[in-house]
């Protein structure tokens, strides 16, 4: 009897697993694995510890996020994305980029993507940008503004930039 129950259970789980695999596309699965690798476990653990009301507030807050922002500040145009513009072509409209293109792709900081728009990115610590003379600080070149100043690295810090004035703001570095 135990063997029969065990076999039935395994068979049922296999059907559910097969169904789940058919319904989950490869890109979503890759994104979930990458998210888990980059701290998703801690996020889920902390989220589950919240009371239902606070969970709802967090979800409502997250629903307001966008994958990109197009801004005009004074006379200047800006495109803000977390990562980059994966699969960039000049003809491609911003709406055509996937979540992966905008969140996980890294831009080529030696390339000017737009002559009339500044591309503001995070995700790539400025310490890892080739030919960067000032690692750990905001990088500006070729109409790029890279604001990830590698807070996770020795000597790294959090950074922000005021697009109206160009003024840069930094936390103290993580060494002190």
Put a short name on every predicted segment.
Residues 1-27, 31:
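Core catalytic region of metal-dependent phosphoesterases/phosphodiesterases
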Residues 8, 152-153, 176:
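A short acidic, often aromatic-flanked loop/helix-cap motif at beta-alpha or helix-coil junctions
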Residues 11-12, 155-159:
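Short, charged, surface-exposed secondary-structure boundary motifs
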Residues 24-146, 150-156, 172:
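Acidic, His/Gly-enriched loop-helix segments that form or flank divalent-metal centers
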Residues 72-75, 162-167:
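Short acidic-glycine loop/turn motifs at beta-strand connectors
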Residues 165, 170-176:
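Conserved glycine-rich phosphate/nucleotide-binding loop
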């Amino acid at each position: 009897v135990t063997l029969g129950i065990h076999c039935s259970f395994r068979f049922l789980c296999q059907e559910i697993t097969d169904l789940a695999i058919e319904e989950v596309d490869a890109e979503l699965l890759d994104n979930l694995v990458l998210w888990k690798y980059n701290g998703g476990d801690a996020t889920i653990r902390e989220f589950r510890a919240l009371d239902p009301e606070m969970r709802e507030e967090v979800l409502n807050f997250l629903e307001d996020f966008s994958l990109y922002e197009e801004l005009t500040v004074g006379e200047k145009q800006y495109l803000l994305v977390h990562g980059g513009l994966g699969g960039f072509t000049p003809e491609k409209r911003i709406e055509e980029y996937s979540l992966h293109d905008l969140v996980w792709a890294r831009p080529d900081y030696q390339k000017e993507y737009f002559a009339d728009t500044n591309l503001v990115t995070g995700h790539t610590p400025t310490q890892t940008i080739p030919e960067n003379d000032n690692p750990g600080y905001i990088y500006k070149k070729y109409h790029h503004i890279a604001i990830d100043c590698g807070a996770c690295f020795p000597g790294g810090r959090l950074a922000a930039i005021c697009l109206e004035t160009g003024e840069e703001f930094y936390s103290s570095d993580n060494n002190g």
